[in-house]
Amino acid sequence: MKKVEIKKKTIKELNIELMNLLREQFNLTLQHSAKKLQQSHLLQHVRRNIAQVNTILAEKEKECD
């Protein structure tokens, strides 16, 4: 996901996106631990997306204060 796309979203949408990413990370971690994950790089992508969403979310919350 591009940063421009993330910045256009509202705080509510960002929270929903964050929950979806965390759920996806959990599922990928389970698959990885069971040795069923063929594309282990997906974990890194999801982790990066979580960090980006958290950063933008913090910026938007700071703006509201």
Curated annotation (Swiss-Prot):
Instruction: Note the superkingdom of the native organism.
Output: Bacteria
InterPro entries from the xrefs?
Ribosomal_protein_uL29, Ribosomal_uL29, Ribosomal_uL29_sf
**GO cellular component term of the entry, any:** cytosolic large ribosomal subunit
According to the UniProt entry, its GO molecular function terms are: structural constituent of ribosome
Q: Give the family from UniProt.
A: Belongs to the universal ribosomal protein uL29 family.
Please give the PANTHER family that the UniProt record associates with this protein.
60S RIBOSOMAL PROTEIN L35/50S RIBOSOMAL PROTEIN L29, LARGE RIBOSOMAL SUBUNIT PROTEIN UL29C
Q: Would you tell me the protein name for this molecule?
A: Large ribosomal subunit protein uL29
The organism named in the record is Buchnera aphidicola subsp. Baizongia pistaciae (strain Bp)
Q: What is the lineage of its organism?
A: Bacteria, Pseudomonadati, Pseudomonadota, Gammaproteobacteria, Enterobacterales
